[in-house]
Amino acid sequence: MLCVIARIDPGARERLAALRRTGETWDSRTGELYGHITLATYVGDAEDRFIASCRELLSGCRTFSVRYGRIELLPATSILVASPDKEGALLALHDAIAEKWSGALDRWTGDERWKPHTTLLYDPDGDLAAAEAVLRKKFSPFTARVERIEFSRVEETGYTIVDHVDLPA
C-alpha cells in the first residue's frame, strides 16, 4: 500500500500537535502527529508507474492553502480528526489522481467517499466522544499551507517515505 500525502507547513503541524497536548490525558494509540492529509491510497502493483504518473500531475502544482474548519469523530475507523475543507487545489489534486487511478485506489480514497483529514487521536477502545468535546472547545479554524507531496509506503510497523515533490511557491 502506497499513500500520496499532502504535507502541511510546520506552523500548522505545531498548531495541531498543541491541540493534542491540551492537558488532558489521552489513552491513545496515536504516535507523533505527522501533519498530513492523505490524498490517495494506491493498492495496485505498479508503484513506480503510479509515482511517475502522480509526479506528472504535480508538475504544474504550486504550494496551496487548505482551511481546517472542524474537529470530527470518524467512528468507523476509531479516529478523531481535524478536517480541512474539501475544495480548491486539495480537491482538484485528489480528483485528478482518482480519475486516473480509480481502479487501483482503496475504497476510502478512490471516489466521493474520500474525507480529507489529519488524524489527531486513534483509540478503538477509548472514549473519543469525550476527547472530541474537549478538542472542539479548544479548536479555532485556521489555514495551513501544503508545501510538499510525499509518497509513503505503509509497512508492518509504521511507514517509509519513498519519494516526494517539493511544491514551488
Task: Give the label of every model feature segment.
Residues 41, 83, 153:
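Pocket-edge structural micro-motifs
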Residues 135-137, 145-154:
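Low-complexity, intrinsically disordered Gly/Pro/Thr-rich segments
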Residues 69-77, 111-116, 149-159:
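Short proline/glycine- and acidic-rich turn/helix-capping motifs at secondary-structure junctions
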